[in-house]
Amino acid sequence: MRINPTISGPGVSTLEEKNLGRVAQIIGPVLDVAFPPGKMPNIYNALVVKGRDTVGQQINVTCEVQQLLGNNRVRAVAMSATDGLTRGLEVIDTGAPLSVPVGGATLGRIFNVLGEPVDNLGPVDTRTTSPIHRSAPAFIQLDTKLSIFETGIKVVDLLAPYRRGGKIGLFGGAGVGKTVLIMELINNIAKAHGGVSVFGGVGERTREGNDLYMEMKESGVINEQNIAESKVALVYGQMNEPPGARMRVGLTALTMAEYFRDVNEQDVLLFIDNIFRFVQAGSEVSALLGRMPSAVGYQPTLSTEMGSLQERITSTKEGSITSIQAVYVPADDLTDPAPATTFAHLDATTVLSRGLAAKGIYPAVDPLDSTSTMLQPRIVGEEHYETAQRVKQTLQRYKELQDIIAILGLDELSEEDRLTVARARKIERFLSQPFFVAEVFTGSPGKYVGLAETIRGFQLILSGELDGLPEQAFYLVGNIDEATAKAMNLEVESKLKK
């Protein structure tokens, strides 16, 4: 669907042109506003409350209309704190939904839900803006070709490949490398696809958002010298913000991504961390609006809200939005309505394992738990599919044998099983890879590995051609040629020591 971005000056135009109302009631972040008869705003219109609070401070609170109550009243949800608001304050109907800046001006900057920069780097060019509420692209505009989105990360491309224009769920606890994986993907898409990324921090910790920003500056994803050369736009609505802001910040990020897809005709990567917080904020707003709760206390409109966000994340004939969404699973219950509703929209899952992280294997992607609908012979080809299946079978057999090894030791295994274990350990290490964004910490240069190289490497390990090489030769290398070169270096080093 083509965006028609508006070319306009920033802010609200003169009061005389707009409908004016008055605040009639305030309950937390929810405001009831009375308008003159025949001057009612539409659902999703942005309202601006202007005036002074009880101590004379200037107030400027933006709200979004959610319900028409009758008796010339509307109920709106505030996008920022409502402290200091009083009944009788003047409310301006802007006559349109919330609009945010889009285009190249957003790159390298941090925004809040309203599209206002919050990084103290000065104003942003707001001549090109776009409303955050839009319908999903029409069916006829969708690109239905199934194509793989190559990330340059071996474990992802081989075992759980991403779909171009697809949605990926990223499951992982604290400290297993979600942020580093996200940053590497942003870096790789910028280099290999010339694309841009948009990061939507939905209800996340402020500290994490700050850490991500600092790490992006360190790794060069955000270019401090020439901000326009940056490859990412950041939109944050943290945990401490009102539910209205957390509910809409995902749409703000998506709107920026849609512009890059539809107008600039680029492939865009959209990160949402965390999609569960989007549902949680919707649940809070639903309760504040007085709707009857549904299963487990969630909003009755859960599927509709999730669908309206997810259906806009798609490939069109112009470009694609590939979305990677961190998914928090409450109490590890996958049947909870929030993750269950999210699963229905995902094309692939990337599960990060604490066990692999503890072994020092990064990225700590669990090769057996991660899944993808793209791993089918008719999509990825027979060679890729067969290699992936054999890798999984080898790793699965190793997993089954681990109890026996722990109790009896390797010597008690049959010759065939010992060979399987040796190859599985090589595969496990070869699934690790040095990242560009981790260069500053590890000192080893990052590697982008093409899909063909990845398949060739694993085929050589499975065929037994590399059985003579030590397993540490496969740890943190790019392609298989680097592993053989590393093995030769290790051999030379060991001879020198003797």
UniProtKB/Swiss-Prot annotation:
Q: Which Enzyme Commission number(s) are on file for it?
A: 7.1.2.2
GO cellular component, as recorded = chloroplast thylakoid membrane; mitochondrion; proton-transporting ATP synthase complex
- Supply the alphabetized keyword list: ATP synthesis, ATP-binding, CF(1), Chloroplast, Hydrogen ion transport, Ion transport, Membrane, Nucleotide-binding, Plastid, Thylakoid, Translocase, Transport
What membrane topology does the UniProt entry give? Peripheral membrane protein
Q: Which InterPro entries match?
A: AAA+_ATPase, ATP-synt_VA_C, ATP_synth_F1_bsu, ATPase_a/bsu_AS, ATPase_alpha/beta_chains, ATPase_F1/V1/A1_a/bsu_N, ATPase_F1/V1/A1_a/bsu_N_sf, ATPase_F1/V1/A1_a/bsu_nucl-bd
Q: Where does ATP bind?
A: G172, G173, A174, G175, V176, G177, K178, T179
| GO molecular function per UniProt | ATP binding; ATP hydrolysis activity; proton-transporting ATP synthase activity, rotational mechanism
One GO term of the biological process aspect:
proton motive force-driven mitochondrial ATP synthesis
According to the record, the segments passing through the membrane are none
Q: Keyword Cytoplasm on this protein? A: no
Q: What is the documented function of this protein?
A: Produces ATP from ADP in the presence of a proton gradient across the membrane. The catalytic sites are hosted primarily by the beta subunits.
Please name the PANTHER family in this protein's record.
ATP SYNTHASE (PTHR15184), ATP SYNTHASE SUBUNIT BETA, MITOCHONDRIAL (PTHR15184:SF71)
Q: Which family is it part of?
A: Belongs to the ATPase alpha/beta chains family.
Official protein name in the record: ATP synthase subunit beta, chloroplastic
| Origin organism lineage | Eukaryota, Viridiplantae, Streptophyta, Embryophyta, Tracheophyta
